[in-house]
Design a protein with these regions (language model features):
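PLP-dependent aminotransferase-like
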Residues: 1-29
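Amphipathic, non-transmembrane alpha-helical secondary structure
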Residues: 2, 30, 34, 83-91
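Short, well-ordered alpha-helices that flank and scaffold nucleotide-derived cofactor binding pockets
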Residues: 6-10, 34, 55
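Beta-loop-alpha module in the N-terminal Rossmann-like domain of NAD(P)-dependent dehydrogenases
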Residues: 25-31, 45-52
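Short, solvent-exposed polar/charged micro-motifs at secondary-structure junctions
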Residues: 28-32, 141-144
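Glycine-enriched alpha-helix->loop->beta-strand junction motifs that scaffold or abut catalytic
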Residues: 35-41
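ALDH superfamily catalytic-core signature
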Residues: 40, 46-167
Length: 167
């Protein structure tokens, strides 16, 4: 968002046409949604938060754009450019620790290449450098919070309970 703002300014967009404001939802986000002079809200994130925004903004007839609860699949066919697909699939699964709405959270693979893909994907993921998020060599850093870590771990536990295998 910050870079988008810089690009728009460099392109000559007048000040005040696009405003990018960073902050936490309960303080900054709530103030933006409730402000009577803000006529449009765009939000990408969780469904629960989106519903809260809609409840507040809709009676004020604000324009709303809500992109909620993404479950983006990677769909992989046998005739793809295999190396390019593998690189993109690893990146799309683990960019920003998998915590952004654009990350692939599911992978559908054509049966004829499933075994090869599974082995190659796991091998590439194991090569990712886990470490300090401030180190330039780190490819996988920390999750955003302890509650988020607990949520991720609960999904892993659930997968195991349902017969899944951690690769």
């Amino acid at each position: 968002a910050f870079l988008l703002g810089k690009i728009c300014t460099q392109a000559g967009l007048p000040n005040g046409v696009l405003n990018i404001i960073n902050g936490t939802g309960p303080s900054v986000g709530q103030a933006i949604v409730e402000h009577p002079n803000i006529k449009a809200i765009s939000f990408t994130g969780g469904t629960k938060t989106g519903a809260s925004i809609a409840r507040t903004a809709a009676p004020m007839f604000k324009k709303l754009s809500l992109e909620l609860g993404g479950k983006n699949p990677n769909i992989i066919f046998a005739d793809c450019n295999y190396e390019k697909m593998l690189s993109i699939t690893v990146k799309s699964s683990f960019a920003n620790q998998g915590q952004i709405c654009l990350c692939g959270s599911r992978i559908f693979v054509e049966k004829s290449i499933y075994s090869k893909f599974k082995n190659d994907f796991v091998s590439r993921v194991k090569e990712l450098k886990v470490g300090d998020p401030f180190a330039s060599s780190t490819q996988i850093g920390a999750l955003v919070s302890k509650p988020h870590l607990d949520k991720v771990m609960s999904y892993i536990d659930l997968a195991k309970e349902e017969g899944g295998e951690v690769l």
